[in-house]
């Protein structure tokens, strides 16, 4: 597969990772800010929709943070999409075609485990320093490190955002054992089954949360990445700014509309990916901005692992501060600086 034929170039993928990590980092702190309405991520609550509509009808100084909370949960979907896209290019069309299933799963598990273990160590050091009298239970921590905590209903996950590690490992297993070099029709059938499962359970119930913290939520964006890598080899349609703007406008309207209804909410990853592709292709025309997102993309793994530690430091300020924007910017600044400092630690094999 020639490089120029790819829908998303290496640079565009890195920019998309940069966009995704900023959304993830912002989302995991923003909804703790006082007066900001929570968004629907794992469950669909009509109260959250009503809260956003109320803020839309009574715009005040906090509205930009409400808007951020409304759109920021999409970062995880982008990470999952890029995983599907990248794995397919490497292991079905690139240098990894001769990799055995055992080597594939072992290498990805160890990579996630080491990254997570370093993050947990940093988090625990801070947590025990700030709360020396608190008890840390080993059982939930071991389950989290082994990336099986998601499979246990109501099992505490420490730090909270690390639920992603267990979920993405489930995706890797299913991809390699079920989807790898097999018919895309089979993959679409499995995605349809997962959507039906989520559609028939209570939108705001515990089962919905359990399904979405595991494989079900990830299947649609991941398989979309696989399908794009397999079947959409050219992107001449998106070569002009006009077409990108049209795609961005249509997808953004559909994305926003889908967030207000439960069944369409399940299909959000499709429009999230479309919006993001249009955004990165438009930003590519501005070298200064694209270089920033490319840089953030290169730092995304460390940012993801480090940001829960910074969040823990500033949670009280988020809940009590009368200057929410100052706290949010302080959080983002501290997260980026700490990630830059610790990047060599996470780069070590």
What role is predicted for each listed range?
Residues 195-302, 306-331:
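Alpha-helical transmembrane segments and terminal signal-anchor/GPI-anchor hydrophobic tails
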């Amino acid at each position: 597969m020639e490089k120029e034929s790819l829908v998303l170039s290496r640079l565009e993928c890195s920019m998309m990772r940069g966009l995704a990590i900023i959304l993830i980092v912002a989302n995991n702190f923003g909804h703790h800010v006082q007066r900001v309405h929570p968004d629907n991520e794992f469950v669909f609550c009509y109260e959250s929709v009503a809260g956003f509509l109320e803020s839309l009808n009574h715009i005040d100084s906090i509205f930009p943070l409400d808007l951020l909370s409304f759109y920021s949960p999409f970062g995880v979907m982008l990470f999952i999409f890029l995983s599907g896209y990248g794995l397919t290019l490497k292991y079905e069309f690139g240098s990894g075609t001769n990799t055995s299933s055992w080597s594939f799963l072992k290498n990805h598990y160890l990579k996630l485990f080491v990254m997570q273990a370093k993050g947990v160590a940093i988090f625990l050091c801070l947590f025990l320093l700030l709360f020396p009298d608190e008890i840390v239970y080993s059982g939930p921590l071991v389950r989290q490190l082994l990336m099986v905590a998601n499979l246990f209903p109501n099992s505490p996950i420490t730090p909270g955002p690390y639920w992603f590690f267990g979920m993405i490992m489930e995706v890797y297993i299913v991809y390699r054992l079920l989807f790898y070099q097999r018919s895309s029709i089979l993959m679409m059938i499995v995605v349809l089954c997962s959507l039906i499962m989520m559609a028939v359970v209570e939108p705001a119930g515990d089962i919905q949360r359990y399904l979405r913290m595991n494989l079900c939520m990830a299947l649609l964006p991941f398989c979309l990445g696989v399908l794009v890598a397999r079947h959409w080899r050219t992107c001449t349609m998106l070569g002009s700014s006009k077409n990108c703007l049209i795609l961005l406008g249509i997808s953004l309207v559909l994305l926003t509309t889908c967030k207000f209804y439960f069944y369409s909410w399940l299909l959000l990853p499709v429009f999230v990916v479309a919006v993001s592709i249009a955004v990165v292709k438009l930003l590519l025309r501005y070298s200064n901005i694209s270089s920033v997102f490319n840089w953030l993309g290169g730092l995304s793994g460390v940012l993801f692992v480090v940001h829960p530690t910074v969040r823990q430091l500033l949670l009280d300020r988020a809940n009590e501060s009368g200057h929410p924007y100052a706290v949010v910017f302080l959080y983002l600044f501290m997260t980026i600086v700490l990630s830059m400092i610790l990047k060599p630690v996470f780069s070590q094999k």
